[in-house]
Swiss-Prot record:
<keyword id="KW-0963">Cytoplasm</keyword>
<dbReference type="Pfam" id="PF01208">
    <property type="entry name" value="URO-D"/>
</dbReference>
<comment type="function">
    <text>Catalyzes the decarboxylation of four acetate groups of uroporphyrinogen-III to yield coproporphyrinogen-III.</text>
</comment>
<keyword id="KW-0210">Decarboxylase</keyword>
<comment type="similarity">
    <text>Belongs to the uroporphyrinogen decarboxylase family.</text>
</comment>
<dbReference type="InterPro" id="IPR000257">
    <property type="entry name" value="Uroporphyrinogen_deCOase"/>
</dbReference>
<feature type="site" description="Transition state stabilizer">
    <location>
        <position position="77"/>
    </location>
</feature>
<comment type="subunit">
    <text>Homodimer.</text>
</comment>
<dbReference type="GO" id="GO:0005829">
    <property type="term" value="C:cytosol"/>
</dbReference>
<feature type="binding site">
    <location>
        <position position="209"/>
    </location>
    <ligand>
        <name>substrate</name>
    </ligand>
</feature>
<dbReference type="GO" id="GO:0004853">
    <property type="term" value="F:uroporphyrinogen decarboxylase activity"/>
</dbReference>
<dbReference type="InterPro" id="IPR038071">
    <property type="entry name" value="UROD/MetE-like_sf"/>
</dbReference>
<dbReference type="InterPro" id="IPR006361">
    <property type="entry name" value="Uroporphyrinogen_deCO2ase_HemE"/>
</dbReference>
<feature type="binding site">
    <location>
        <begin position="27"/>
        <end position="31"/>
    </location>
    <ligand>
        <name>substrate</name>
    </ligand>
</feature>
<dbReference type="GO" id="GO:0019353">
    <property type="term" value="P:protoporphyrinogen IX biosynthetic process from glutamate"/>
</dbReference>
<protein>
    <recommendedName>
        <fullName>Uroporphyrinogen decarboxylase</fullName>
        <ecNumber>4.1.1.37</ecNumber>
    </recommendedName>
</protein>
<keyword id="KW-0627">Porphyrin biosynthesis</keyword>
Length: 354
């Protein structure tokens, strides 16, 4: 593989010295870019775009051509695993994901296959290999998966949800069934992420989008427990260097200490968390990624720069911070805003790394 020219993202995740704070944006390959919308139109629909390695590579690289980002992230979806398990994933026009065969019974859980990453999910690995080749060592490639809890919410609810009544009914009325499902999903995620690493991903991230809807004990038992299992099962070194692992629970600020005990290298934090406090709590164990509210990108360039400066000041001196948004970028932000954001981070962070 080509030698890496810019490794400050990987170094920051391992809390090693860097010259400036690295940055990438969740959903940086996405609908806010006109070139993404054009490529998606060529593909026909979202999953066709994910399944075409050349087009998935193209949209992964698009934001890097516009902005001096410090990492690329695989263009894919967290629901590839349940889709490969045969649940019948579809995306309606203007709608979220839907599953034709939601999980409701013991038999349904028992019958779920664990997908072969080089079989039903080979299209993802082909995309990883293609992107890694086309990056030519410019920046590292991030692979990812949804967390078992977050995948289970979609599989049991049959799609997106606001109240999560079906999966919470299973959690409280039949916890053993939910544990069986989560355990199987954890095994599937371990295989999937390790295959991404073998295919060329240089860092991996677990997105626990819906962990924050759980109560305290339930989060530890039904979400974090299974992320811990995944972290323990991952390949942690490849191509002669460490493969850092980042956990991100949206709304998970109260569990940072417990998350840091999993053996991961970094924690993603959303905008509800003060970075100075997070660093004081867990900065001796893990790096932190985040955490600007994506809605700040609707503001003026001066306001964006002000927010960047504030977050950099919150983290303070030293390595161990990857700048990011607190969640995915919105599709209708002004076209110049991401450039202001990225350039401000690189410019204003340098004094913190002397």
């Amino acid at each position: 593989m080509t030698a890496l020219k810019n490794d400050r993202y990987l170094k920051a995740l391992l809390r090693e010295p860097v010259d400036m704070t690295p940055v990438w944006m969740m959903r940086q390959a996405g609908r806010y870019l006109p070139e993404y919308r054009a490529t998606r139109a060529v593909a026909g629909d979202f999953m066709s775009l994910c399944r075409n390695a050349e087009l998935a590579c193209e949209v992964t690289l698009q934001p890097l051509r516009r902005y001096p980002l410090d990492a690329a992230i695989l263009f894919s979806d967290i629901l590839t695993i349940p889709d490969a398990m045969g649940l019948g994933l579809s995306f309606g026009v203007g709608e979220g994901p839907k599953f034709a065969h939601p999980i409701e019974t013991q038999r349904a859980v028992q019958n779920l296959p664990i997908p072969d990453p080089e079989g039903e999910l080979q299209y993802v690995m082909n995309a990883v290999r293609t992107i890694r080749r086309e990056l030519k060592g410019e920046v590292p490639l991030i692979g990812f998966s949804g967390s078992p809890w977050t995948l289970a919410t979609y599989m049991v609810e049959g799609g997106s949800s606001k109240a999560f009544t079906k999966i919470k009914k299973m959690l409280y009325a039949d916890p053993q069934l939910l544990h069986q499902l989560l355990d199987k999903l954890a095994d599937a995620v371990i295989l999937y992420l390790n295959a991404q690493i073998k295919a060329g991903a240089q860092s991996v991230m677990i997105f626990d989008t819906w962990g924050g809807v759980l109560g305290h004990r339930e989060y530890l038992d039904f979400s974090l427990h299974y992320m811990h299992k995944i972290v323990a099962g991952l390949i942690r070194e490849n191509e002669g260097r460490k493969v850092p692992v980042t956990l991100f629970t949206k709304g998970g600020g109260m569990w940072l200490e417990a998350m840091a005990e999993t053996g991961c290298d970094a924690l993603g934090v959303d905008w509800t968390v003060n970075l100075a406090q997070a660093k004081a709590r867990v900065g001796h164990k893990v790096a932190l990624q985040g955490n600007m509210d994506p809605s700040v990108l609707y503001a003026s360039p001066a306001r964006i720069e002000q927010e960047v400066r504030s977050i950099l000041a919150d983290f303070g001196e030293g390595s161990g911070h990857v700048f990011n948004l607190g969640h995915g970028i919105h599709q209708d932000v002004p076209e110049q805003s991401p450039a202001v954001f990225v350039n401000a981070i690189h410019q204003f962070s340098q004094p913190y790394h002397k």
